[in-house]
Amino acid sequence: MKTMVKVRTYILAGAIGIFAFTAFGGSARANPKTGEAEFKEYCSACHFDGGNLINPAKTLSKIDREKNGVKSVKDIIKIMRKPGEGMSMFDEKTLPETDANKIAEYIINTFK
């Protein structure tokens, strides 16, 4: 009898967990993060205020970006996917294309 109660409890707990995961997972997609929020999550530790803790010659300012051949959203995403020495790689599994685009657009529009 006690075993049956435990089994029911585990089944109920699992069902509630699945429901909560799908319910809240769906709401997260309905309210996507902004480029600024994505930047803060993935980039700001090394690129605080558009700087560069690892390589100060490669900040996110327009002047430094252009000096280093980074002129477009596509160029920024290319670096995210295959970065140089000292930068973490953000593949599509880690950072989906839509989020990478938001970050790149945020960089271009924010760091002049």
Name each region found by the language model.
Residues G25, K67, T94:
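Residue-level detector of flexible, active-site-proximal loop/helix-junction positions
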Residues P32, E36, F48-K78:
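Gly/Gly-Pro-rich "capping" loops immediately C-terminal to redox-active cysteine motifs
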Residues G26, F48, E92:
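Short, conserved catalytic or interaction motifs in soluble domains
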Residues M1-N31, Y106-K112:
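Post-cleavage N-terminal segment of exported redox proteins
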Residues F39-D49, I103, I107:
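The canonical Cys-X-X-Cys-His
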Residues I54-D64, I79-K112:
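Axial heme c-ligation environment in periplasmic c-type cytochrome domains
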Residues F24, A37-K40:
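Processing junctions and N-termini across compartments
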